[in-house]
Swiss-Prot record:
Membrane-spanning segments: none
Family statement: Belongs to the MukF family.
Subunit description: Interacts, and probably forms a ternary complex, with MukE and MukB via its C-terminal region. The complex formation is stimulated by calcium or magnesium. It is required for an interaction between MukE and MukB.
The species this protein was found in: Actinobacillus pleuropneumoniae serotype 7 (strain AP76)
InterPro entries recorded: Chromosome_partition_MukF (IPR005582), MukF_C (IPR033441), MukF_C_sf (IPR038198), MukF_M (IPR033440), MukF_M_sp (IPR036141), MukF_WHTH (IPR033439), WH-like_DNA-bd_sf (IPR036388), WH_DNA-bd_sf (IPR036390)
Keyword Cell division: yes
GO MF annotations, alphabetized: calcium ion binding
Gene Ontology cellular-component terms listed: cytoplasm; nucleoid
HAMAP family to which the protein is assigned, alphabetical: MukF
Cell compartment(s), UniProt: Cytoplasm, Nucleoid
Keyword list, A-Z: Calcium, Cell cycle, Cell division, Chromosome partition, Cytoplasm, DNA condensation
UniProt name for this protein: Chromosome partition protein MukF
């Protein structure tokens, strides 16, 4: 079966060579194409006359300060250039008396869309796109669980995934690449600001850094919220493909979508990490520039700003960390003399084994009457009663020993019936126990 997902690299290379594709757009040509695209969107029939194109080129020519005398000739050259590069299609016949009709090609739409609409990357747009994807994948997974022949899978599973979900993933991926370009532009703006007035530059840099960081985190939170659910739905479809060798094309599409989704989500976190590093770099640069101001450039600017304060008021932000005092005397020698005297009873040492033996003997004596008289042992009540007699530091050891000794005596009949007991508080510090009443003793 021919691969329906993508062409191979050699096929694409030969296809490009046979059609002699080539792209070359100068700034004025690109502006002309964008003007055509925007004007075309306002047309109901999508058709453009040559006079329309010349009028649009006139606007471009005025912005680029080009000569009016050669306008018609340059407009014709620009139109022919866009037709040659397949950005425009020209239609003419003997009935139109030399008047041609133009339509923008898919290539022209794609290039213009990249520069115009793809810059509108926001959390709202991303949320809507992910919502559409979730609905499409949900319907596809429901259809996959119904089963059916290859035709059914192709129409109800493969088609929506390939022509809706995959295209939206590609759109999100392209938007993310636009965000990369936007970050580079912000870095260039910050570099320009740092060469200007210092106190204004620092404030503007902080604003740019904070806005970009906030946008990246907001977009990443949106992706993370939907990513796991989308992956789960794709796995749900993939599980329906087990044993269906005739549906390999669907399985390959699922794998491609999973890779695209992983790439989209990982991009967000990588972008945040890189931006955090850049944020720190900018702040370090500012601090270093101030600390290593050998020529006193910053000092001169500060003095000049103070002199001109009433003409150009400004705010000064200061921060001072509390000093850490070193109370140690550097000349103090280590005192190795032995301490003499008696320790308080609270500090006297008792080995852990001695303490445990004492507690065990006490608990055995306390629990023995329950077995002798056949009384049930409510561990919660016993623990609560006994722990009240000991300091908090020994509660853990006492509770463990009580439970060990009680379990040796017998078991709870409710345990064999799989009845889960409720949690009971056993001290005032939040400790709780979950245990059924022991009512069956060992013989």
């Amino acid at each position: 079966m021919q691969n329906e997902l993508a062409q191979t690299i050699p096929e694409l290379i030969n296809w490009t060579k046979e059609r002699e594709f080539s792209l070359s757009l100068s700034s004025d040509r690109l502006a002309f194409l964008l003007a055509i695209s925007i004007y075309n969107n306002e047309q109901t029939d999508g058709e453009l006359l040559e006079s329309d194109l010349i009028d649009l080129f006139r606007y471009v020519s005025e912005v680029f300060d080009q000569s009016e005398a050669t306008l018609t000739q340059r407009a014709n050259n620009a139109i022919n250039d866009l037709v040659k590069q397949r950005f425009l299609n020209r239609f003419s016949s003997e009935f139109t008396e030399g008047l041609a009709i133009y339509r923008i090609t898919p290539l022209g739409v794609g290039v213009a869309d990249y520069y115009v609409r793809q810059r509108e990357f926001s959390t709202l747009r991303l949320s809507i796109q992910l919502s559409i994807v979730a609905d499409e994948i949900q319907r596809a997974s429901s259809a996959a669980e119904e089963g059916g022949d290859e035709r059914f899978w192709r129409n109800n599973v493969f088609a929506p995934l390939k022509y809706s979900v995959a295209e939206i993933f590609d759109s999100i991926d392209l938007s993310q690449r636009m965000m990369d370009e936007n970050q580079h532009q912000i870095r260039e703006r910050i570099a320009e600001l740092l060469s200007q007035n210092w106190h204004e530059a620092i404030l503007s840099c902080e604003q740019l850094l904070d806005e970009t960081s906030g946008n990246l985190r907001e977009l990443q939170d949106t992706l993370n919220a939907a990513g796991d659910k989308l992956q789960a739905q794709l796995l749900r479809i993939q599980s329906c493909l087990i044993g269906r060798d005739d549906l390999d094309f669907v399985d390959q599409l699922i794998v491609n979508l999973q890779n695209k989704l992983d790439r989209i989500i990982s991009w967000g976190q990588q972008a945040i990490d890189l931006w955090i590093g850049y944020d720190r770099h900018v702040h370090k640069f500012i601090r270093t520039a101030i600390d290593m101001d050998k020529n006193r450039v910053f000092g001169q600017r500060l003095r000049q700003s103070i002199q001109d304060y009433f003409n150009a008021p400004w705010l000064l932000y200061t921060a001072k960390a509390e000093s850490l005092l070193d109370l140690r005397d550097d000349e103090t020698m280590l005192n190795e003399t032995e301490a003499v005297g008696e320790l308080p009873s609270e500090l006297e040492y008792e080995s852990l084994s001695d303490v445990q033996e004492q507690i065990i003997s006490v608990m055995q004596a306390h629990l023995a009457p329950f077995r002798a008289e056949g009384k049930p042992i409510d561990l919660g009540a016993v623990l609560r009663e006994q722990l009240a007699l000991y300091p908090q530091s020994r509660h853990f050891d006492v509770a463990r020993i009580i439970v060990d000794q009680a379990v040796k005596l017998g078991m709870a009949s409710l345990d064999s019936q799989a009845v889960y007991p409720e949690w009971q508080a056993i001290n005032d510090n939040g400790a709780e126990v979950q245990a059924n009443v022991i009512d069956q003793y060992n013989k």
